[in-house]
């Protein structure tokens, strides 16, 4: 959140986009969707050694309380509808992280029953390669997602009654 203009000692102005993006990136609540070996590394990332809480990242078990889903492991064609349903239950804005070679590209499983990358069904924001990726890699991926969220451009016109107008009303 960049400071645009200091006013005196106690007042700081900033853009609404910057303020909202700062709040969103500082409180990511991912839902864990561990399907294979990568889930163990995801659990290790949530342990005390790496301390995700210091980044405002708290794992949630319900998609209705999450704004990010971490898909970790082999996604089969039978599991894909479940992942889509969980994704649709998440409120907007929502982000997707593909963790591990299997979630990113199908991994070593080049077969009819394995989805060759979860990006065939969901819009993936961050890819974390590895088999399985280390907890530090997941932490780095989450920090990259925070950077991406911080640079997003939002349109809050509809929230204050302006709709999608680009020009002021006459």
Swiss-Prot record:
One of its GO terms (cellular component) is respiratory chain complex I. It catalyses: a quinone + NADH + 5 H(+)(in) = a quinol + NAD(+) + 4 H(+)(out). GO terms for molecular function: 4 iron, 4 sulfur cluster binding; iron ion binding; NADH dehydrogenase (ubiquinone) activity; NADH:ubiquinone reductase (non-electrogenic) activity; quinone binding. Pfam families: Oxidored_q6 (PF01058). Binds 1 [4Fe-4S] cluster. The keyword Membrane applies. NDH-1 shuttles electrons from NADH, via FMN and iron-sulfur (Fe-S) centers, to quinones in the respiratory chain. The immediate electron acceptor for the enzyme in this species is believed to be ubiquinone. Couples the redox reaction to proton translocation (for every two electrons transferred, four hydrogen ions are translocated across the cytoplasmic membrane), and thus conserves the redox energy in a proton gradient. PANTHER family: NADH DEHYDROGENASE, NADH DEHYDROGENASE [UBIQUINONE] IRON-SULFUR PROTEIN 7, MITOCHONDRIAL. This is NADH-quinone oxidoreductase subunit B. The lineage of its organism: Bacteria, Pseudomonadati, Thermodesulfobacteriota, Desulfuromonadia, Geobacterales.
């Amino acid at each position: 959140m960049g400071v645009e203009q200091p006013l005196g000692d106690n007042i700081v102005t900033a853009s609404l986009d910057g303020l909202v993006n700062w709040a969103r990136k500082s409180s990511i609540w991912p839902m864990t969707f561990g399907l294979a070996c990568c889930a163990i590394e995801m659990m290790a990332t949530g342990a005390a050694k790496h301390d995700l809480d210091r980044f405002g990242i708290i794992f949630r078990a319900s998609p209705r309380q999450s704004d990010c889903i971490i898909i970790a492991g082999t996604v089969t064609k039978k599991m894909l509808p479940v992942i889509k349903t969980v994704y649709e239950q998440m409120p907007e804005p929502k982000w997707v992280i593909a963790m591990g070679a299997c979630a990113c590209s199908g991994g070593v499983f080049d077969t009819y029953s394995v989805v060759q990358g979860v990006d065939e069904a969901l819009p993936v924001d961050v890819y974390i390669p590895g088999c399985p990726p280390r907890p530090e890699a997941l932490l780095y991926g989450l920090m990259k997602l925070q950077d991406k969220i911080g640079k997003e451009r939002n349109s809050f016109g509809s929230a204050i009654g302006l709709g999608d107008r680009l020009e002021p009303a006459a």
